[in-house]
Amino acid sequence: MSYQGKKNIPRITSDRLLIKGGRIVNDDQSFYADIYMEDGLIKQIGDNLIVPGGVKTIEANGKMVMPGGIDVHTHFQMPYKGMTTVDDFFQGTKAALAGGTTMIIDHVVPEPESSLTEAYEKWREWADGKSCCDYALHVDITHWNDSVKQEVQNLSKEKGVNSFMVYMAYKDLYQVSNTELYEIFTCLGELGAIAQVHAENGDIIAQEQARMLEMGITGPEGHVLSRPEELEAEAVFRAITVASQTNCPLYVTKVMSKSAADLISQARKKGNVVFGEPITASLGIDGTHYWSKNWAKAAAFVTSPPLSPDPTTPDYINSLLASGDLQLSGSAHCTFSTAQKAIGKDNFTAIPEGTNGVEERMSVIWDKAVATGKMDENQFVAVTSTNAAKIFNLYPRKGRIAVGSDSDLVIWDPDAVKIVSAKNHQSVAEYNIFEGMELRGAPLVVICQGKIMLEDGNLHVTQGAGRFIPCSPFSDYVYKRIKARRKMADLHAVPRGMYDGPVFDLTTTPKGGTPAGSTRGSPTRPNPPVRNLHQSGFSLSGTQVDEGVRSASKRIVAPPGGRSNITSLS
């Protein structure tokens, strides 16, 4: 599938670049070599390369050179209740590049009952005009019927979308039923697409929200109190179950709790094709801030599923990410201003949900996982770039340093230290949930489409230069096992002769019996006769009809060795 063209959008001219003296880090190996790039592609890798004149040389001085990051979960320029997130595609992708990310995958969120295709085209128009780096799109399924099914099929086959998200929460807005979940997973599995889920039990959340408000809890702490992690875990388990029944690969977005992460880990060990996506927030910070006395600060952390109030959760999730039980990372970058958040100042259920994280994602993971010895540099590349490229069928064009791959590269300094502050981040949001954190590891140089985007701490970006990258269905990384299981899972009826015995006539149901066609009771157990209360056996004389009949609960004492009345069956 080729790149999609755009009209009247400035194109960047790729530089001829030579990176010398760097240590190339892929997900499976690290080695020293030089890299020559031209026309936005990697042309040569090796020592003593022969390159044309006029090449710009970048001295890596032994620093790591790795594939540019891929942020698989963003919400740039997203409309919400008459508002729009403060970071549009220009500001959002600019922040991404500042943190070492050279491609993002944004979520298209159609209004309920509206066209998925029209929403997709709207997102394309916004992103084509403003994105500074390459991008792809997920499409969220916010309602379900035959018309939506046809749109999903068209988006998958014609529009370069291979992932669709459904919501198990947001009752009466986006939430799908279990039956719809089954139908959607079946459809996506047939298309070779990836089923993503926002996993929370929306029915229970609605009840808990009402209970919190009745108790007078209206602040941001009500958000986490009404969404305990058990509700995330229950939905994850349910989604895994439905995905297994439909033989559809499952992708759990925003893994926020230990319980949810454990369920994904256990399911993978049992052979389920399921992927888990923790986000910058769940990897870098906890939910104790919901109880801050400063309402604006507490509200800045409101996202769903909520951050866990257990302060050991980020370390735990980083460990599972390092071990491969969770496979990749996103940021779920969805920023609202404090004034926008304040529409819920008297009711936590009205606070717009979302946090920052696109710029901080790679440094947070390096600081929390690599610098602490949980994962090595190759695993870091896997969870920030390569696994995403494999899952969404972008590999090896993205996510790898190899001849023929896109020249999206990052020269990474593991010793660099930066202190996060809203005063100097690229996001428009006036608050940063990682404020004051000292993070080890940062990009020195960022190259996207063969063009230097970040150098010496200065950004050089071009609005609208980002390309839409279509994602083809049936990714081998995702579907190889699914295809094999389909061949093995063909169901066949048992060959047997025709039954020619007696058949009970349901039309002659006795008076007082269960009406024909009733589904009450077990279909395999005959229903006991219904007692006619007008023909009661109770007598005032003291002698009853059932006198002498042993009660089922009455114990009979048998002699040693037991008492037998069984006759021979021979």
UniProtKB/Swiss-Prot annotation:
Q: Which InterPro entries match?
A: Amidohydro-rel (IPR006680), Hydantoinase/dihydroPyrase (IPR011778), Metal-dep_hydrolase_composite (IPR011059), Metal_Hydrolase (IPR032466), Metallo-dep_Hydrolases_sf (IPR050378)
Instruction: Provide one Gene Ontology cellular component.
Output: exocytic vesicle
**Which positions bear Phosphothreonine?**
509, 514, 543
Is NAD found in the keyword set?
Answer: no
GO process annotations (BP): actin crosslink formation; actin filament bundle assembly; cellular response to cytokine stimulus; negative regulation of cell migration; negative regulation of neuron projection development; nervous system development; neuron development; positive regulation of filopodium assembly
- Residue(s) carrying Phosphotyrosine: 431, 499
User: PTM comment for this protein?
Assistant: Phosphorylation on Ser-522 by DYRK2 promotes subsequent phosphorylation on Thr-509, Thr-514 and Ser-518 by GSK3.
Its annotated compartments are: Cytoplasm; Cell projection, Growth cone
List the molecular function annotations (GO) for this entry: chondroitin sulfate binding; filamin binding; hydrolase activity, acting on carbon-nitrogen (but not peptide) bonds, in cyclic amides; identical protein binding; phosphoprotein binding; SH3 domain binding
Which UniProt keywords are given for this protein, alphabetically ordered? Cell projection, Cytoplasm, Phosphoprotein
Name the domain of life: Eukaryota
- Pfam families noted in UniProt: Amidohydro_1 (PF01979)
Tissue-specificity statement: Isoform 2 is expressed in growth cones. Up-regulated in motor neurons during axonal regeneration after sciatic nerve lesion. Overexpression of isoform 2 increased neurite extension and branching. Isoform 1 is expressed throughout neurons and their axons.
The ranges of region (Disordered) come to: 506-570
> What positions are modified (Phosphoserine)?
259, 518, 522, 536, 539, 541
Bias (Polar residues): 506-524, 533-544
Q: Subunit structure of this entry?
A: Homotetramer, and heterotetramer with CRMP1, DPYSL2, DPYSL4 or DPYSL5. Interacts with synaptic vesicle protein 2 and SH3A domain of intersectin. Interacts with FLNA.
NCBIfam families per record = D-hydantoinase (TIGR02033)
The entry assigns this protein to a family as follows: Belongs to the metallo-dependent hydrolases superfamily. Hydantoinase/dihydropyrimidinase family.
Q: What does this protein do?
A: Necessary for signaling by class 3 semaphorins and subsequent remodeling of the cytoskeleton. Plays a role in axon guidance, neuronal growth cone collapse and cell migration.
Under what name is this protein listed? Answer: Dihydropyrimidinase-related protein 3
Q: Top-down, what is the taxonomic lineage of the species of origin?
A: Eukaryota, Metazoa, Chordata, Craniata, Vertebrata
